Amino acid sequence: MTSGIYYKGLQCWIPDEQSQWIPGSIKDCRVEGEKAFLTVQDENENETVITVKPDDLNYEGRNGLPFLRSINSDADDLTDLSYLNEPSVLDALSTRYNQLQIYTYSGIVLIAVNPFQRLPNLYTHEIVRAYSEKSRDELDPHLYAIAEDSYKCMNQEHKNQTIIISGESGAGKTVSARYIMRYFASVQALIQSTDSNFHEAPQLTAVENEILATNPIMEAFGNSKTSRNDNSSRFGKYIQILFDGNATIIGAKIQTYLLERSRLVFQPNQERNYHIFYQILAGSSSEQLEKWKLVENSQEFNYLKQGNCSTIEGVNDKEEFKATVDALKTVGIDNDTCECIFSLLAALLHIGNIEVKHSRNDAYIDSKNENLINATSLLGVDPSSLVKWLTKRKIKMASEGILKPLNEFQAVVARDSVAKFLYASLFDWLVATINKALMYSADKSNQTAKSFIGVLDIYGFEHFKKNSFEQFCINYANEKLQQEFYRHVFKLEQEEYAAEGLNWSYIDYQDNQQCISMIESRLGILSLLDEECRMPTNSDENWVSKLNDAFSKPEFKNSYQKSRFGNKEFTIKHYALDVVYCAEGFIDKNRDTISDELLELFTNSDVPFVKDLVLFRLEQTAPPADTKKIKTKPKSNTLGSMFKSSLVSLMSTINETNAHYIRCIKPNEEKEAWKFDNQMVVSQLRACGVLETIKISCAGFPSRWTFDEFVSRYYMLVPSAVRTTESLTFSKAILEKHADPTKYQIGKTKIFFRSGVTPLLESARDKALKHAAHLLYEAFAVNYYRTRFLLSRKRVRSFQAVAHGFLSRRHTEYELLSSNIIKLQSLWRTALKRKEFIQTKNSILKVQSIIRGFLLRQTLEEKTKHDATLIIQSLWLTFKAHKHYKELQYYAVRIQSLWRMKLAKRQLTELKIESTKASHLKQVSYRLESRLFEISKQLDNSEQENNKFRERIAELESHLSNYAEAKLAQERELEQTRVLISDQSQDGELKELLEEKENALIMMEEEMRQVNDANTELLRVNATLKSQLKNYDMIIVEQTSQLKEKNRIIASLTKATKILNSASSIEQSRNSEEKSRRDSSLMEMRTQKEMLVLLMNDGLKHDLDKLTEYAGRTFTTLKTLLLKDNDVEAQKLDHLFLAKLLFIIISQMWKSNLCQESVALVERYCVHTLEYVFQKTSSANERPDIGFWVANTHALLAFVYTKQQAFKHSSAFTLLSTESHESVQTIFEMIESHLSKIFFEWVRQVNNFLKPLIVQAMIITGTNTDAGDENRKLRIKFFEKPKYKITDVIHVLNKVHDSCQAYKVNYEIYNALIRSIYRFINVEAFNSLFIDERGSWKRGTNISYNYHVLKDWCLESGVPEAYLQLEELLQTSKILQFVKDDPNYVARVRDFYALNFLQIKTLLHRYDYADYEAHVPKKTMSELSKNIVAEGINQREQLTYEVLDYRLQDSFEESPSLEKIKIPDDCNVTYLRRIIDLASAEESVEQALITVGNVADNDVQNSSDEENQVPNGIKV
């Protein structure tokens, strides 16, 4: 039998000496009569039996019962723990700390556990943006959440705020305060620059920089290294950040409390003096050190070497000194004043080195001591006077004064008092100067502070082996703050109970008012201390004796305890623990002053800074009534009384503000990163009051649930018939059945439970779930086994049917096989017999054929022999007849040859006689050769001229048609010009232009007539030449037969003559073309003159502006036409006409040497385009399609690049000036930069449009609209479905794709655009999982589904590499879908290269588990944390976004053709039209000249080829 809240299997905590608490479980719980036995088993399987009364089982932790373990051990808020007890709180903090989560809420308190490692990624400006304008519960616990909460409360409630940061030394208070101040400064800059990029740090104002500059100053002069902390604040400070009515920072004010002055003259082992001294020695120049008589080695100074620690690991004192000097300048302290400050600090180091000797019983200081001289020279005082008043004291007796020598100890105390006095004065002066600078900023801006947010960075509770006056004051301040904290928590509890309408009674809690009254009352400890200080013969022992007499009464037994051994110690029972104080030095530290003589000495210092510093100190410490009496020392306040009054003022300020609490925890004494010491943390939780706060909460209603949360957790405790969608009714039904009405109360929005109710509900929930699981198992088992039976029966029957069929088929097959075998046997026998018959028959036939063949061959052989005999006989007879014929033929030929020889000899004799006639034959030969040469030359010339005339005729006919069209265009333009002149009444310059145009027309007509005449003449000459050619051919044929013997020589001479005649023909052709070129040059000069006038006219600029505006109005229509494939309209509106026209104008300017004007023109185009693009984006209905401007700008860039390359490879480029070269390059760079700006604006607009869609479309929705939310509320309520889906994102991407297709945007730009958009989707969706949303298994499937949708779109749209930008999302989806309790989980996630371990751990930490899911084991989280530390803790959680740039290829498009450019008809741009027409005409003329030049070049080339064809062996 079980009873109460304890039952078998319940998780609990078991006390342990080393770890405080270890996890365990209840093995058995039984009640036997008047006793209850609880068997508890720890994690090592050690069992313990606890015997209690049965009634004790209803109360957690009573009479040795174990505390219960919470289900959610890593809750963000400790008050959300299922069981609010000390071990659960400790376990929650330890679990989060091991998961690298250093911040945890505990109700209104933020607990910050020091990681002892820099975490810069936790405080970036992206994190500032994330927490800005968010409520505290929306995001993970953070310093910025507390800061934002205070900022929001100040704006909404119009009430001043205070953030109280407390904790012991080394807990991280200073760093926390620093980051809070940085947050306020950064969030102000963020609000004032809402359009800044998400990943760019906001720009701070001068006031905000000054406020942030106070941190390095105060840390340098007020912080030091201690055994517990490398940067321990040795003073308390309260910084008020002032805001005006618009919640804008206008200034600040700093208040300090109790500077530890004794640290200046003494430091314990391994501790340092204040940072500023080490910074001066490390950061000052050699000249400065020489000036101040210092050396770099700090061990040379008595005030710096006592702690045997001169450096801090990881801290560069030289760099810190530079930062301190810069901060001093930021707050308005000039270089001269800085020199004075450092000179004073150097003097203090020299004072510490002044050696005090003893002479008998008196102290002695050598007046020639080097350190004394250095100190007095820097302080501007007389060395002998300083020595006098350090070794003697003046005792006033009535009207006289007596000088009393001091002993060595007293002189050292006097020396150290001077140093402490001067340093404390300097510190207070710095604070006042900083306040004056910060308030000056507010006065200068003529603004009044309406509210403030105070940041209190004050020392935490301290307890050392030896506790002195400083620890007493610090603990006194913590008593006051703790009391205020208790009241604040109690007040919030009361306010919440009242707001919810609960019936509640007074909650009893520990009040430390008695301890505070004992310290600060009229007859309290501080008053008795001040009284003892005023006594002539005072001592610490006398003071302790008075304390014992006053507080040894019974009413102070809970606050005070006297020492058992003498009057040197006393004990105060503080709220945290009892502290034993050593009374030695209390009186001297409380007085904290120097003699009047020393004050007068420094008041009369020769150094103005030292003098002003002492006077400032006297004014600050003197009572108000005596402030004017400076030369005589007034009755000054003691340090204890001043601290008490400042503390009372501080508490009054805090009471008037809304307080926010941050408790800093030091996790271990060794300052080792990520080490959690349970015992040390528990002691601090007790000291800072967190556990006491939990006790206060437990005394009332420690557990509270909203209706929806309660129903979603415990809906299974009532039958389904009782369930309703109204959560309040549903909650009441659950409570009536399972809870005692006295143990809970129902408020307006929440249900409040007393201690012990939650375990009962959890027990009932476990039972209900087990019962439901049992029912489900029964139903599943019945269904499972019935299904198995039916399936088995079906399979048996199927097997039987198969077996029957198999046997039947087998019998049938046997019968068929037997029948077939018989048939086969008969067929086989038949085949054998047939085979034997065929073989016999074939043998007989073969024998017969052999015999017949033998007989036939024998007959054939006899016939062959007979025929051969006849052939041999005929061949022999033939041979004999042929031989006789050859003999007769030989003799006949011989006779003929002899006769011919005789005739030849006779003819030779005749030729010798005629040899005298040779000269005559040569002359005839020469005339024939000359005639042949002339005929050959005329033939070649005729052929060449004929070819040239044919080409010229074709060319002139083409030009004739072009000139006709040009004439019509000129006449229309001339008519327009006349109308323009008549309408605008222009001056004589336009008339002259008109006359020139008319003359040009007349010249063109004259040239056309000449061309026609030339054409007729050419036709006539061609006919004549053809007839002559025929005659020449006949002559050549006749004379060729007469000159065959000398053909080789004649051919060579003819070739040489042809080469000379060809050169003469080319010269004549060039002379004929010269006149045509002169005429063309004249016309070109007139065209250039008119072009120059138009390019210099301002009307061109206005035309370009009109054209830009026209493009802006009509490009969306163009895209619509292009998408509809309307070819006719699309051809009318060329989407690149703007770029082409602008390039033509730029080209004409370059030709006219107007390079600077072209730069101005391009700049004008860029400015107007950007104005249009940026201004029009404010209207959603008229959103510009930037694809048009991107396409035109890229086309213009391509045209300019092509022209630039053409210039570089032409001779004209070398003729341009250096300024022209620079102008061309400037235009290219300007257009390239302009293209980049438009591209980035395009990306920005698309991203802004997608931003509100991404989270819902990528994470919350997936395969169905309800897919994203794992919240169990969906089981009982219907919420509004997500607004956006992935189809909405695809719709935006389709628009971008259509725009790029419509305007034919360059592929590289299109690729970069899509990749940038995908990168933005990836970054926004991924970062939302670390800020606003939580991951879950279902959301992992949603992300995976949406990823593949976007991937498919990429593949379809021609950018297959864009989906690689979503790699982080893809791997995130896999992590969310992995089984969380997999023992190899860490090994599996190592393959995710796109994510670091910090991101993986954060995803798991923020994972929203469903009821059926197993949680990630602590071992896995610890292993992930170890990997994070091993790889470096400074990993980034969130991704940063950058627009991906495009990579333009070097191969651009070629320059546009003028024939393809058409200005829209409805665009009134007169000047621009005329420029295009002139450029078109110029291009036509240039093309014609190029054609004529090519013809002449071809002629020269042909002649050259003929020269090279001279036969071998002939010399020309």
Swiss-Prot record:
Locations listed in the record: Cytoplasm
Dilute domain: residues covered: 1163-1431
Binding site for ATP: 167-174
UniProt xrefs under Pfam families: DIL, IQ, Myosin_head
Coiled-coil zones: 926-1034
Stretch list, region Actin-binding: 647-669
Modified residue annotations for Phosphoserine: 1065, 1072
Domain IQ positions: 793-813, 818-838, 840-865, 866-886, 888-917
Keywords in alphabetical order: Actin-binding, ATP-binding, Calmodulin-binding, Coiled coil, Cytoplasm, Motor protein, Myosin, Nucleotide-binding, Phosphoprotein, Repeat
GO CC annotations on file: actin cortical patch; actin cytoskeleton; cell cortex of cell tip; cell cortex of growing cell tip; cell division site; cell tip; cortical dynamic polarity patch; cytoplasm
All residue ranges annotated as the Myosin motor domain in the record: 73-766
Domain Myosin N-terminal SH3-like: 7-62
InterPro entries tied to this protein: Dilute_dom, IQ_motif_EF-hand-BS, Kinesin_motor_dom_sf, Myosin_head_motor_dom-like, Myosin_N, MYSc_Myo5, P-loop_NTPase
One MF annotation (Gene Ontology) recorded for this entry: calmodulin binding
Gene Ontology biological process terms, A to Z: actin filament bundle organization; actin filament bundle retrograde transport; actin filament organization; formin-nucleated actin cable assembly; protein localization to cell cortex of cell tip; protein transport to mating projection actin fusion focus; vacuole fusion; vesicle transport along actin filament
PANTHER family associated with the record: MYOSIN, MYOSIN-52
General function of this protein: Involved in cell wall deposition where it has a role in the localization of mok1.
Family to which the UniProt record says this protein belongs: Belongs to the TRAFAC class myosin-kinesin ATPase superfamily. Myosin family.
Protein name: Myosin-52
Name of the gene: myo52
